Amino acid sequence: MLGDGKEGTSTIPGFNQIQFEGFYRFIDQGLIEELSKFPKIEDIDHEIEFQLFVETYQLVEPLIKERNAVYESLTYSSELYVSAGLIWKTSRNMQEQRIFIGNIPLMNSLGTSIVNGIYRIVINQILQSPGIYYQSELDHNGISVYTGTIISDWGGRLELEIDKKARIWARVSRKQKISILVLSSAMGSNLREILENVSYPEIFLSFLTDKEKKKIGSKENAILEFYQQFSCVGGDPIFSESLCKELQKKFFHQRCELGRIGRRNINWRLNLNIPQNNIFLLPRDILAAADHLIGMKFGMGTLDDMNHLKNKRIRSVADLLQDQLGLALARLENVVKGTISGAIRHKLIPTPQNLVTSTPLTTTYESFFGLHPLSQVLDRTNPLTQIVHGRKLSYLGPGGLTGRTANFRIRDIHPSHYGRICPIDTSEGINVGLIGSLSIHARIGDWGSLESPFYELFEKSKKARIRMLFLSPSQDEYYMIAAGNSLALNRGIQEEQAVPARYRQEFLTIAWEEVHLRSIFPFQYFSIGASLIPFIEHNDANRALMSSNMQRQAVPLSRSEKCIVGTGLERQVALDSGVPAIAEHEGKILYTDTEKIVLSGSGDTLTIPLIMYQRSNKNTCMHQKPQVRRGKCIKKGQILADGAATVGGELALGKNILVAYMPWEGYNFEDAVLISECLVYGDIYTSFHIRKYEIQTHVTTQGPERITKEIPHLEGRLLRNLDKNGIVMLGSWVETGDILVGKLTPQVAKESSYAPEDRLLRAILGIQVSTSKETCLKLPIGGRGRVIDVRWVQKKGGSSYNPEIIRVYISQKREIKVGDKVAGRHGNKGIISKILPRQDMPYLQDGRPVDMVFNPLGVPSRMNVGQIFECSLGLAGSLLDRHYRIAPFDERYEQEASRKLVFSELYEASKQTANPWVFEPEYPGKSRIFDGRTGDPFEQPVIIGKPYILKLIHQVDDKIHGRSSGHYALVTQQPLRGRSKQGGQRVGEMEVWALEGFGVAHILQEMLTYKSDHIRARQEVLGTTIIGGTIPKPEDAPESFRLLVRELRSLALELNHFFVSEKNFQINRKEV
């Protein structure tokens, strides 16, 4: 963010800036840092030395363009070259060559990487910052026990604790603890140095017994004692180099490497002045930590809040990429060592180029982007989704928490999140509170902390300009910070008023003169998703959370429309998403069509290709439409073409439609929604979806697979759309079951499997009858549509390991239908229950039928009243032809500001349009409307308006599923589960209760046995249902009962059954 020259103005930072800064930091600093750590490598005889010259590294611009990388499923990466030297020590000769080390995937203008043709994004992780933390817990006797936990850069922990006898221990694991004197001695301090460097030497001397003195008499003894206790080894181990190496690897490297941030934190917490480049834990640190712990026991010092953001650090793209580079170079080091020793063994003369291979670096990055939990496939449902995905913060991932182990305190909102992490935007479900979103103005500082901007206030007499400061969570505790609601008030009023402020995690009310800093923007605490909700201050936070998640699920519509009521951030979201085409230079439009725009400016001609029907990974359609005419002069930064879900360079996710809040014959019970057929026939909520189907050809042991149109196994009508090569033609309309690509796989058939006529042909004429099975690509259920693109990707090399891939893209036009999910921007979601004819919908006093009917009972209990303000203001805006952009918390101007604005606009609309029903003083905002079926007015006045309603990606076409017959699970013999496996219904516990409630014993028996898991009976059921007979009752048990018997047998419990006749039963009764 930049502070402008004007007083109190600033610009919102680019929403992708976090990703760009991270990648730039990796290229600028991390790359050199890791390359400079690469050691000099010598052979066993110390005759040859290999080294890298870091200063000469070079990244080459990629030869392939982004668009082609996606098209051909390649990685958009840059080649890394470094100069390497091979020195012969005997002759002092040096051979220097420029060598290729490997490919590093690059970041594009959207802040994403393209790996194997797929857009991927690396999200930021929040980890516990390395350093020392003091906490206290109550033991079983109710006495406070103080502990100091040292966390290393790798996440390893070392706990210091004081027992009842005032002895200090270092706890390595739950079971193992080591005396602090032994640990300090093993790290190289003698007793005299220990006692000189502590504030309470008498406490240390109090638990120093003769036995302990002997243990720490020398460094070797201390290391042996430490090794024995750490590794739980009995007997008398002997001091050796390998023992030291094992300790170094298992203990010191994992638990004692603090890193740059850890060293800074420990110096600050323990008041030390150890140099920053000393990144390992020293005896001085441990002794100072023990001193501080003793001070805590005596009531000095403060405990640490582990959930405070000052005790967290952000692991950004730069850190993750740098870690991977370090890992790749360690692998490369092993390769070079092996190659040098191999060359000497075989008496070959090595060269730098022969020693280095590019495989370690390239494979490390490919596996990182493909497998690492923090590298995710970019969600491209709509432009908002793309941007929000890159601004996520995750507590999960390597070194972090898991959804099962994280407690409520970690998930909860903390005062230090203010202006840094959005208190609203988080995922729902098991990861609630563990995946957050960055606030709009937050940025990542040099030490991995989250910084937020504030304005510094000077005294009036100085007349200085307001200065903007970026503060980390540890800094802003010492300032009085005025909350955002003091923003709009002018100076004169502020001086007389007491204002709400934040100080040391408390919210106070103080005089204006005492304020040091103030917030810069009402949206400062929110993420992008929450900032797009108008009137958010009138909504319950749970509903705002749902809304910020649901806006990311909105499908781009075929005809987008910008919202009447917005917040003002829509334009920046659209521009930063990279979806609209923007002019990079000023000039004149020479030519424009649907595929490209030709622009002339500053002496040269520039062709800008437009995106045409590109599929996103959520199957939505990405498409650009030109917005400029031929001959028009344009400026730099002007919109040339709108993309999916943008209009005039503004985000447009939904439609402004006429809505009434009223019950209608029970069709909007429990959040169901009633809509007019106008929304279907007028293509109001029509969206395009593109599905990808692919097939590969392999070389089998019987020979290569063939793509062909000649497939004898299938009837001609299924092959009607194929061209002479056997691939579906562009523009064809295809239905379920049609062949998209004809393919034959060779197979060897047994003599017995030939038909008699085939055997005769072979015997008489010697004709070899071709044996192959068809393995065509067929269109699955629900996939009907038009073929818009076919791609035949042939990888270089053409071997059996590089199969040819054919991809077919099919476009579907989907109108809105019963079962689709729609939602507003206030967490008001619902499923469409009925589509009414236009003439049956309720209509207004000017004769207009409403488009949608919502249930009014969805508002009061959920407390999302913002939708009512938006609804009424939208109606006024549509009548006055105005668009409103409203910042949140407008009550800081005056009481009831939102209501006054809405009513004044409705009143003005009523006057200008001469429609008194728009604003009726008896029930403002409501109106009398009429039943379309009878023409009678409804009893009560109804709220009508024009809110912005989105169509979400949860569509009935993707979810509806039926099964007549299909696969069964081998173990239970019950139908498989799920749409993708063509699964069937399972009657579960709750369904059984429902049926039991009606006493339907026979239906229950059928459902649970014959039709489900009785292998013979279910075949008979199908036959008798078709013929129309009665279902025969089987005598044997169903499969699930047999499974139960088998499981009991495995527990050595035999279950036998025998038949008791009525006669025997009578005899036994008499005997009794």
From Swiss-Prot:
User: What InterPro entries does the record tag this protein with?
Assistant: DNA-dir_RNA_pol_bsu_ext_1_sf, DNA-dir_RNA_pol_su2, DNA-dir_RNAP_su2_dom, DNA-dir_RNAP_su2_hyb_sf, RNA_pol_bsu_bac, RNA_pol_bsu_CS, RNA_pol_Rpb2_2, RNA_pol_Rpb2_2_sf
Its keywords, alphabetically, are: Chloroplast, DNA-directed RNA polymerase, Nucleotidyltransferase, Plastid, Transcription, Transferase
What GO terms are given for molecular function?
Answer: DNA binding; DNA-directed RNA polymerase activity; ribonucleoside binding
Q: What domain of life?
A: Eukaryota
Entry EC no(s): 2.7.7.6
UniProt subcellular location? Plastid, Chloroplast
- Residue ranges annotated as transmembrane are none
What Gene3D superfamilies does the record tag this protein with? Answer: 2.40.50.100, 2.40.50.150, 3.90.1100.10, DNA-directed RNA polymerase, beta subunit, external 1 domain, DNA-directed RNA polymerase, subunit 2, domain 6, RNA polymerase alpha subunit dimerisation domain, RNA polymerase Rpb2, domain 2
Which protein family is named in the record? Belongs to the RNA polymerase beta chain family.
Q: Quote the function comment for this protein.
A: DNA-dependent RNA polymerase catalyzes the transcription of DNA into RNA using the four ribonucleoside triphosphates as substrates.
Q: What quaternary structure, including any partners, is listed in this protein's UniProt entry?
A: In plastids the minimal PEP RNA polymerase catalytic core is composed of four subunits: alpha, beta, beta', and beta''. When a (nuclear-encoded) sigma factor is associated with the core the holoenzyme is formed, which can initiate transcription.
Q: What is this protein called?
A: DNA-directed RNA polymerase subunit beta
Please tell me the species this chain comes from: Olimarabidopsis pumila
State the organism's lineage. Answer: Eukaryota, Viridiplantae, Streptophyta, Embryophyta, Tracheophyta
